[in-house]
Design a protein with these regions (language model features):
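Short, solvent-exposed amphipathic alpha-helices that sit
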Residues: 68-72, 96-116, 129, 133, ...
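Hinge/cleft segment of the Venus flytrap/periplasmic-binding protein
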Residues: 97, 108, 112, 199-277
Length: 277
């Protein structure tokens, strides 16, 4: 729900009701810590998906967000020839996933002295906000923009804003929204790849598998398990997005748990790792 106070209330209620484990999403890295310790004291482990937590009692599972942001920046910089103006669109400032990816983008662009970050806009991981905020910025600024580094869950709205502005359709990072893939599927020269930070279904299954393995006593070796970003090209996108696709689709790509956080990969992080099924 992206509201720490509500998550804290829900976590305490669920713990008191006798649940065996908790999964939280997209949180501030410190706000939930006392509640996580409370649950741990009751014998209830907590796993975080889509970002990390700093509690010593939590398990964190996600993509390496800083590395993903860095990859996106490097890809965009190379795509536009190593020079020009770029706009960064981050998610929810203050959440670990957004802040880590945002810093990775800044670090990646910093390696290109001829690239200038002309704006940093928060889209709150919401396509409608992404569209409104980017439209506002594009209307107020006449500066030429050569590329957009957009955190996934905002790219469909950002694409709509760019297209309606009448400006050139310059490269933009895409990361799994089917509505945005619809545009790319029918404009295959737009970009050469998508870089995934969080296919939501796969990310949830990743966290659930780690939590269940821990509860079954497989012996978790470390507190945080990260996966690398995943990439797909337009030919792959065209294989599952039809030509008559919906530009306003709110669905996300599922790449498959075997491609995101496979059993073979997870076994490395447990003393007695084995597939659950």
């Amino acid at each position: 729900n992206l509201k720490d106070a509500v998550q804290i209330q829900q976590m305490r209620q669920l713990t008191d009701q006798g649940v065996d484990g908790l999964i939280v999403c997209c949180s501030n890295p410190v706000a939930l810590n006392p509640t996580i310790e409370y649950a741990y004291g009751k014998g209830v482990p907590t796993a975080s998906m889509t970002g990390y937590l700093t509690s010593e009692y939590a398990i964190s599972t996600s993509v390496n967000y800083k590395l993903t942001g860095y990859y996106i920046a490097q890809w965009l910089a190379e795509t536009i020839g190593g020079e020009g103006n770029v706009v960064i669109m981050e998610g929810i400032p203050g959440t670990s996933a957004s802040d880590s990816q945002h810093q990775g983008m800044l670090d990646g662009f910093a390696e290109y002295p001829d690239i200038t970050v002309v704006a940093e806009i928060a889209h709150m991981w919401t396509p409608q906000i992404a569209q409104a905020e980017l439209q506002k910025w594009l209307s107020a600024n006449t500066i030429e923009v050569d590329g957009f580094a957009v955190q996934s869950s905002g790219e469909s709205g950002a694409l709509n804003a760019l297209e309606s502005s009448g400006r050139p359709m310059v490269p933009m990072a895409l990361g799994g929204e089917i509505g945005a893939f619809c545009y790319w599927r029918n404009n295959p020269d737009f970009i050469d790849r998508a870089i995934y930070a969080w296919p939501p279904g796969d990310d949830a299954e990743f966290a659930m598998n780690v939590l269940l393995r821990t509860m079954y006593g497989q012996g978790l070796k470390i507190q945080s398990i990260l996966v690398p970003p995943y990439e797909e090209d337009v030919e792959t996108i065209q294989s599952f997005v039809p030509e008559d696709c919906d530009r306003n689709s709110s669905e996300f790509r599922t790449v498959g748990i075997e491609n995101w956080a496979s059993d073979e990969y997870l076994n490395n992080f447990f003393d007695n790792g084995e597939a659950l099924l």
